[in-house]
Amino acid sequence: MKSLNDLPAPKSTTTTYYDHSNDAWFKNRVTESETVKSSSIKFKVVPAYLNRQGLRPKNPEDFGDGGAFPEIHLPQYPLLMGKNKSNKPGAKTLPVTVDAQGNVVFDAIVRQNENSRKIVYSQHKDIIPKFLKNEGDLGTVVDEEEELQKEIQETAEETKAAIEKIVNVRLSAAQPSNIARQSGDSQYIKYKPSQQSSAFNSGAKERIIRMVEMPVDPLDPPKFKHKRVPRASGSPPVPVMHSPPRPVTVKDQQDWKIPPCISNWKNPKGYTIPLDKRLAADGRGLQDVQINDNFAKLSEALYVAEQKAREAVSMRSKVQKEMVMKDKERKEQELRALAQKARSERTGAAMSMPVSSDRGRSESVDPRGDYDNYDQDRGREREREEPQETREEREKRIQREKIREERRRERERERRLDAKDAAMGKKSKITRDRDRDISEKVALGMASTGGKGGGEVMYDQRLFNQDKGMDSGFAADDQYNLYDKGLFTAQPTLSTLYKPKKDNDEEMYGNADEQLDKIKNTERFKPDKAFTGASERVGSKRDRPVEFEKEEEQDPFGLEKWVSDLKKGKKPLDKIGSGGTMRASGGGGSSSRDDDHGGSGRTKINFERSDRR
């Protein structure tokens, strides 16, 4: 065993026990950590909020135990938060690092900053070739060169073989592949024939033949057809997980119901298709109808404008009535003064005093009250003139006064009734007759259909806001008539008469002339139809033969029939299941046909061709 002294000296030495406390970088770090700890412990008295003029906090102890001061416009770092530590003077000192062999890595100085991500060659071994790095590898340089050349040769051969394979595939694709290859080899076969006589083959006992493969014409079509073999099935198909079957509901059936295709341009068979079916096929019902808010605003504005216009019209009519009343009152005052003057001149007495203006204003409320006062004045004057009257004149005067008094009481009564009706919201007789609807006027016979007025034709605006006419589509699609009503149906003179056909059952009804005379002598202008609930019967004039109405059903809800079925022992659910597959009605059938016959109530739909005009 060799001693340790015989070992060679190491190339590089490292100090195992290295005192790091003497290094400058260690002292700086230790002192910095101590100052930070001491700064976090020491506190400085911070001035009050309004007494911080001139305060410039830079050190951690200037902040006390709090944060930064927002009223001081300086960069502040309480507890050194946010401060860049790379600006410190001790940050440029690099720590000592060692490699795997324990040697100090001095090239850390070169590998810092921008060279930290780069490959830096800082040692002597980095410039030595790879195969000369080790001192004992000088004898193996030649072997490595031979191996390198051998590897290069193998790689070249593999590359050449791959390129030739690709080229041969391209060349064989351009050449025809169905040409059979013909081998030029021939075979010689020696055999003994069965006929050994001298008459065959010159008496030879053995024969030698040359067998050659029969040549193939390259232009012949192929004798065999290549069939494509289907590819074998691989793994079984992936199972599809289905949900369990559930019965189809009515809603699902309605959702799956697809409307028939109805064209808006073609109808070659002339089917009459209702509008609702066209709209269902058009798909307009799927669109949401959005109504603009301006329609409501417009209608409200029109209503307000109409109310204001009505108020203005009523105010103008009221003012006009007052002006007419004042004018009438003035004329009555003048006539009263003239009558007083005439009476005074006739009797020879002095003129009476004129009516004061206050009295005229008080009497201007009601003109009929002025007439009454005028009659009373005349009565008193006639009493003074009694000695000059005869007996007959007096009787006539008294009769006239009675008539005037009766008329005055009638006017007073009408005035009270009108005031009472106005307070209760009722209309007077004249206003009621004037504001009657045209249908009521026609029913009462008050409508003037002859047009005797001869003035300007007045139209009712309500007649233009109807759901019929050319502006509203005129008629349905399945109607081809030009007018919806008859032209002379509302004529009250001729249409009220029922005219029988001439020479129609003359033997049964008698002479036609007598019947016509009887019709002509009847009342023509008596209304044919009266109001409902009238006591008196209407005339027998008709515009058509007698029509009989069906008697109303006494049991519309079927209660008596139900009670009778219960008495007979029938149950309402006896007929369930007796119908077809499409019937699901319970509690008995829904029609008489279902009651009589079982089976489905479904019928065949027949389309009819419409008549084109």
Swiss-Prot record:
Which segments carry the region annotation Disordered?
219-252, 315-437, 513-613
Return the Pfam families for the record.
SKIP_SNW
Taking the record's annotation, the residue ranges forming a coiled coil are: 135-170, 318-349, 391-421
Please report the name of this protein according to its UniProt entry: SNW/SKI-interacting protein
Where, per the database record, does this protein carry Phosphoserine?
235, 243
Q: Which organism is it from?
A: Arabidopsis thaliana
Among the GO molecular function terms of this UniProt record, one is: pre-mRNA binding
Composition bias, kind Pro residues: at what positions? 236-247
